[in-house]
């Protein structure tokens, strides 16, 4: 019996360009736009700029259910609640 050749999973509508590449492009653009200015908190900036829309979109997807959103994110609900409060999203 011949096995079917493996194919990329397109059942979920996988994006043509991986998320990682979008993030890399955004970071490159941000660093270029610094135009020689010093920045000593790029890590925190990137985390904040990624987490805020991530939390908003996952919560919307889960119809505001924080327990489901936390499970989908793979974090504890208390961590999600702490982050939402930290970002003023509550």
UniProtKB/Swiss-Prot annotation:
<dbReference type="InterPro" id="IPR002197">
    <property type="entry name" value="HTH_Fis"/>
</dbReference>
<keyword id="KW-0238">DNA-binding</keyword>
<feature type="region of interest" description="Disordered">
    <location>
        <begin position="1"/>
        <end position="22"/>
    </location>
</feature>
<dbReference type="Pfam" id="PF02954">
    <property type="entry name" value="HTH_8"/>
</dbReference>
<dbReference type="GO" id="GO:0043565">
    <property type="term" value="F:sequence-specific DNA binding"/>
</dbReference>
<dbReference type="GO" id="GO:0006355">
    <property type="term" value="P:regulation of DNA-templated transcription"/>
</dbReference>
<dbReference type="InterPro" id="IPR009057">
    <property type="entry name" value="Homeodomain-like_sf"/>
</dbReference>
<dbReference type="InterPro" id="IPR005412">
    <property type="entry name" value="Fis_DNA-bd"/>
</dbReference>
<feature type="DNA-binding region" description="H-T-H motif">
    <location>
        <begin position="66"/>
        <end position="85"/>
    </location>
</feature>
<comment type="similarity">
    <text>Belongs to the transcriptional regulatory Fis family.</text>
</comment>
<dbReference type="InterPro" id="IPR050207">
    <property type="entry name" value="Trans_regulatory_Fis"/>
</dbReference>
<protein>
    <recommendedName>
        <fullName>Putative Fis-like DNA-binding protein</fullName>
    </recommendedName>
</protein>
């Amino acid at each position: 019996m011949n096995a079917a050749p493996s194919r990329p999973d397109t059942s979920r509508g996988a994006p043509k360009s991986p998320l990682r590449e979008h993030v890399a492009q955004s970071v490159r653009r941000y660093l270029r736009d610094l135009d020689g200015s010093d920045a000593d908190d790029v890590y925190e900036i990137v985390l904040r700029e990624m987490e805020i829309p991530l939390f908003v979109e996952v919560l919307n997807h889960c119809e505001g259910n924080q327990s489901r959103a936390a499970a989908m994110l793979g974090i504890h609900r208390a961590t999600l609640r702490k982050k939402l409060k930290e970002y003023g999203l509550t």
